[in-house]
């Protein structure tokens, strides 16, 4: 629907029988009104054509083929005349066959039927409005109560019967026999109110504004009383107050939306358009039909049986009529929501029928799968894994996914570079996975961003743009720092990849959606690309080092009680052989790769002659003299090599390969930032 502000919207709610009739009914040029489905048939087994007035009737729902009626006559559609032409013999209009996607029909129910969503769903709207227990209403709807309190205010037999303190037991056996008498209809109309008709009468007598006023007065009275001191009574009062609030809100909703409560009881049952419940022919000539067709057939069968009982035979026992009304109610319940009353209905293969509720709800329902989310071209999906070698703005695409996503671009490049004469030759080269294909694919990907999306997309960081690179394997590689924006984990999460096709979409991806641009949370402004979990553990391992340093072991006051032999052993552990010296960081990392030292092994790294390394008043822990006159001033974390004239020849700092690695990463990042500025 389109509101007054020209906004397209979809609203689900109750509708009047007149509205249902308006949707389904149409008047043919000969004056005949069609729209009611009266037969439970689909297609004729000989002619393979839809049955007249059946669930696929062409007069009601429109022609199967555009411009062709059931007789086989053809007319050009699109005539500008106001009156749509139809066949004089079969009554089928000459219109587009797409009308079968939205043209509805209806079933005229022989008895009122309660909508199971409003009765059985919690909270029960009908029970809330009538202020009656749900079990009592269910017994009334499904005819489990033979008698109900009369709706009329005039004195009746049942009202007088309710005044007796004790009930004669023989009544329980004698009254059912009265159902078989000829005067039962008169007695039933006056004394008995049962089934969905009783619910409809009570809902029709409601005044919503009186309900709001009376509920508000009762709520205030309960609030003025205050706590009683009895926990059970206080809880009971609290539940009653909550119920009154829900009842007032429900009544206000009905007033605001201009919905009559009696519309929750159906008199006309809408029939979905045929294209939404198709019958499809598969291999071998077999037919596959939607479960909704079978459920509609069950409703029509039982409704026609009840109609025959009410119209053709006046001597039908009352219990049989009530039983048939119950069957109609159960058939409509199964159509709307199979299994809501307990055991679901199954077919001959013990498979549960898929009702209308099953079709529209859930992840695979009509709304989420077809309307809210759709399958689109140029998209793929795979598991995400960590790509530690990737930049923040890059993502790794497996070869299988990349060649499918960018296949059209690769084909165009192959033809432009005269490496393929036509599309077929280009596709064959792609299937054969020629080396030139991967080179062109890398070139295409170099200038084309992709979008990664992780469902559910709760905020704008749930979908970001990346520069794709080819990776081996079948998983999408992702930089670990962008994990938090997607709220993803590398424990089996899946992400979808989309290719923006238009220039506008590519420009938007580059300027607004790239991951290295979205570094702050759009909600609170805090940094969102921060190291967490495995990255923090890795940084800790890199920078932890070996705690057995000079100060910890040799000059710790708690070790003064150690014997000279132990001190001698400690001195031996920190010689040049145990703590090697390196001229630069490249030599240190090379030694680590050759497995000569460990990641946390202490080492001495030659440093530039920077006086800032030397503390102003720090005294050396040891001084080692060489035979040529040079000597070493050894401090806690560095040492200084001096000449005989006390000139500084070189400085060595005590570090580990882990510290060197993280320092180099930070230095490269700072240099790259300075160049970018």
Swiss-Prot record:
Cofactor list: Mg(2+); Zn(2+)
Top-level division of the source organism's lineage: Eukaryota
Catalytic EC class: transferase
Catalytic activity, as annotated: RNA(n) + a ribonucleoside 5'-triphosphate = RNA(n+1) + diphosphate
Subcellular location: Plastid, Chloroplast
Residues noted as binding Zn(2+) in the record, renumbered to the chain: 69, 71, 87, 90
An annotated GO cellular component: mitochondrion
Keywords: Chloroplast, DNA-directed RNA polymerase, Magnesium, Metal-binding, Nucleotidyltransferase, Plastid, Transcription, Transferase, Zinc
Gene Ontology biological-process annotations: DNA-templated transcription
EC number: 2.7.7.6
Assembly and oligomerization: In plastids the minimal PEP RNA polymerase catalytic core is composed of four subunits: alpha, beta, beta', and beta''. When a (nuclear-encoded) sigma factor is associated with the core the holoenzyme is formed, which can initiate transcription.
Protein name: DNA-directed RNA polymerase subunit beta'
Biological classification of the source: Eukaryota, Viridiplantae, Streptophyta, Embryophyta, Tracheophyta
